[in-house]
From Swiss-Prot:
Tissue: Expressed by the venom duct.
Modification type 4-carboxyglutamate: residues: E52
Modified residue annotations for 5-hydroxylysine: K55
Modified residues (6'-bromotryptophan): W51
Residues cleaved off as propeptide: 20-35
Record keywords, A-Z: Amidation, Bromination, Cleavage on pair of basic residues, Disulfide bond, Gamma-carboxyglutamic acid, Hydroxylation, Secreted, Signal, Toxin
Protein name from the UniProt record: Conotoxin De13.1
Annotated family: Belongs to the conotoxin G superfamily.
Signal peptide: 1-19
Modification sites for Histidine amide: H69
A GO term for molecular function: toxin activity
Domain remark in the UniProt entry: The cysteine framework is XIII (C-C-C-CC-C-C-C).
Modified residues (4-hydroxyproline): P40, P44, P58
Originating species: Conasprella delessertii
Length: 71
């Protein structure tokens, strides 16, 4: 394999891992094939406005989706 091929292979392996890193309020972790985020403690478990529980965290059935304390 040429040097360029090895570099491409390394980039293809590293890029998906970098996608799990998030800046801001949540910390990304991979669990059981899905992406779960640790929500800020100030983020409610239910959605007051019906579409977003806190900045960037969507609601599913009135609960914060993708967060450890939301189902």
């Amino acid at each position: 394999m040429s040097g360029m091929g090895v570099l491409l292979l390394v980039l293809l392996l590293v890029m998906p891992l970098a996608a799990f890193h998030q800046d801001g309020e949540g910390e990304a972790t991979r669990r059981s094939g899905g992406l779960k985020r640790d929500c800020p403690t100030s983020c409610p478990t239910t959605c007051a406005n019906g579409w977003e529980c806190c900045k960037g965290y969507p609601c599913v059935r009135q609960h914060c989706s993708g967060c450890n304390h939301g189902k």
